[in-house]
Structures are given as C-alpha cells and as structure tokens.
Amino acid sequence: MADSAVRVRIAPSPTGEPHVGTAYIALFNYLFAKKHGGEFILRIEDTDATRSTPEFEKKVLDALKWCGLEWSEGPDIGGPCGPYRQSDRKDIYKPYVEQIVANGHGFRCFCTPERLEQMREAQRAAGKPPKYDGLCLSLSAEEVTSRVAAGEPHVVRMKIPTEGSCKFRDGVYGDVEIPWEAVDMQVLLKADGMPTYHMANVVDDHLMKITHVARGEEWLASVPKHILIYQYLGLEPPVFMHLSLMRNADKSKLSKRKNPTSISYYTALGYLPEALMNFLGLFFIQIAEGEELLTMAELAEKFDPENLSKAGAIFDIQKLDWLNARWIREKLSEEQFAAKVLSWAMDNDRLREGLKLSQTRISKLGELPDLAAFLFKSDLGLQPAAFAGVKASPEEMLEILNTVQPDLEKILEWNKESIETELRACAERMGKKLKAVVAPLFVAVSGSQRSLPLFDSMELLGRSVVRQRLKVAAQVVASMAGSGK
C-alpha cells in the first residue's frame, strides 16, 4: 500500500471529560499519518444517546485542538466522507444490518432486558462468563415476521461460528488467536434503530476508507466480531494495531480513581500542550537518554510504529513535570513565556471562576495567591498540622472522610448544588451537623482552614481531583489516629 493511501482516525465518544488516554491514542494516529503522508480523521462516536452530549463533544474538540492535533476531516470542518458524527449517520447503517440478516449471518432477538439479566445471573452463578445463549436463533421465519409486523421490540444480533477460532495479525501483538466460543453474539442494531459501537465502527471505517485502526488494547478481544462483520459484508478489514494501555506507576490501569486523567486538569494547572504531547510521544519512539525534549515535528520524524512495546506505558507525573519544566526553561523565549502565561490566564475557566469567588474575600490583590493557590496545585503537601483547628478527633475525621468518598461518587451532575445536596444527606445519615462534616473536607480540598467556599471549590476542581485529595487526606488523618495525635 502506498503511503499516500494511509487514512487513520480518532473516534472518541462525547460521554465525559476528554481523557489523556484519548490524547495518547489520537497522537499515535496523528504521528502515523504524518509518518506515511496520510490523512488523520476525527469522527464522533455518539451511539450512546443517553450519555453523549454536545457539551462533551465541544470539550473533546477543544481538548484535541489544545493538544496541537489537526485533522483533515471531521464534524467541525466536514469532508468527502461525512457526516462525521454517528448520530447524523443513523440511516446509513440499517441497510448493512439488513444485508447481514438477509445473507443468514444475523438474526432478530426479542429477548427482554429482564430475561437477559436472568440469563446472565444464572451463567454467573454457574461460573460461566455471561453471553447470549442463542434462544432466538431457533425462531422460525414465520414467527419472526409475525412478531416484527406486530411491532414487538427487538434487536439484531450477529451469528458466531460454533467451533474453531479467529486468527488475525495485529500490528503490535503479532499473530493472535481467539476461540469463537469466547465471542458473544453481538447486538448490531438496537431496538431504537441505532447501531451498536461494533456495527457503526465497521461501517464507518469502511465508508471513510480507513486503512489502519489504532486503538487501545481493551478492544483486542472485539477484533473477531469486527472481522466477522467485514466478512459478512464482503469487505476487506483494515490493519489493526492495539496499543498498550497507559498505567500508573504501580502498573495498575490508569484511571480517574487513582490520578487526574482529564485533559482539562492539565490545562488548568498550566501544563504546556507541547510538553504533554512530548511526554506521550516518547512511548512511540526509541531515543537515547538526553534526547527527550522533542517538538511534534521531531516526534513525527522519529516515530517508530514497528517497535511498539506490549508493556503498559507508565504515566509518570514526575517525568511529565520534568519535561514541562524543561519546555518552559529551554524551549520558550522570554516573550513566548509571557505570552503563554497570559494566554493560560485568559483562557482558564478555573482561574476565572476562582477570581470571582476571591473578590469578596480579599482586601489586597497580594492576598490572592494564598487564598486561591490550591486550585492550581497538583499536590497540596497536606500535613497533620493543617487539621489542628478542626473540632473533631482524628477518628471522627477519618469516619467522615471515609463515609463521604463513596457518597460523592453517586453524584451524576458534578456541580456545587448536587455536591451540597449529597453532603447534607450524608451529614443527616451520620447524625451530624453539616458544619461538622465539611470542616475536615475543607482542609482536605484546600489544604487550609481559610479558603474559598467549599462546594464551589469542589465543583471547580472537578471530581477526579477532589477524589484524590480526599484519599490523601484520609491517609494523613489515619496516621494521626494511629499515632494518637
């Protein structure tokens, strides 16, 4: 295949805050396109209508643009293979699904959600992995026609071979073999007429002429389904490349429960996009020590997709901080540095909102750093002394911190109103006054007993940062309880 024919894509779902993992996969695809003189495409996969929102889509586009990634086709700029938003392509998918059914490779399933849940519970109880049991495979054509004509809700599933295995070549993992018995009869078309991720993914990649699909290793197990769909439609599958997931320093999967993972966190704290891309790009190249500081153009030049490691890429915050510091000191002139600072301040929603909250709480501008600095720190350096003024024992504070953390996870819409509502309910369940519950939280979140309003601050910091700070605070307070302080 000629390099000029290479077409890759990043296809995020707008269901939450843009994740650094999305930037990681996007950067690989971007560099792959640059390396081969190909095209980098952006597609929005919003088949999950209940969780996808225009607000999150805008955040995704803004985050990828902030990262310095430019696409030649996408929902914001159009292109010859549009639309580039799956919800705008709904009518495109159904003929492909009907083709699969007509050729005997798919079937209509009338099982209710209740029946499917009972089936899964029984399978789990028997120690078996939950998957569809094929009940509707045995329905006659006449019964299917009758039930469809009666308007009975149903989905369309794909048939799976009953023996043998799927063998394929992956650009990272090499030769892979997955037994068909491990593959579920995947739903292709939901009852509401929307395709599932798997169906839409294959159809869109085909119609958008995608030649290489690079995504996270969590999708490796789905390749047999995708290969089957390509075969059922008589289409040639792309080259698959499954990248190792980013992991924490302890080798656990990178997740918002352990570290801040949203791109907005890094923008708010003043990380340079060039440094973040530099940091992520180092996972895709082979370099000698001392050559780590690289621009996007240099990353593209050194990009080496043939020697990718299956070992998890370690997301080392300290290394990112080191690279960011080097970028500030070595790559920016004094004028560029000043421009970066001003741009960061002007475009920083967290700073803007923090200033609003600070205005009525300071008498001099010089007091602002002490009051609001906690909004921009990655580590508060929390010590037992910070809790000295809280009128509660370490044991009581620990109980509050441990009780509040899971309750805050229940919040669907993270804002000051929902945070206050949940904490009031938590205080009532604990038989305490709200003031007693928020006192240790105030210190945990801000590192001080004099700061900005708690609920507003928690909203500004975001769920993942608050989660991390409460976890650290619980560790500090636990040490106080253990030492008898």
Curated annotation (Swiss-Prot):
Name under which the protein is recorded: Glutamate--tRNA ligase
Gene responsible for this protein: gltX
SUPFAM superfamilies, alphabetized: An anticodon-binding domain of class I aminoacyl-tRNA synthetases, Nucleotidylyl transferase
NCBIfam families for the chain: gltX_bact
Enzyme class, broadest EC rank: ligase
Superkingdom of source: Bacteria
Span of the annotated motif 'KMSKS' region: 253-257
Residue intervals passing through the bilayer: none
Residue span of motif 'HIGH' region: 12-22
Chief subcellular location: cytoplasm
Assigned protein family: Belongs to the class-I aminoacyl-tRNA synthetase family. Glutamate--tRNA ligase type 1 subfamily.
GO MF entries: ATP binding; glutamate-tRNA ligase activity; tRNA binding; zinc ion binding
Gene Ontology biological-process entries: glutamyl-tRNA aminoacylation
EC number(s) recorded for this UniProt protein: 6.1.1.17
Entry keyword Cytoplasm: yes
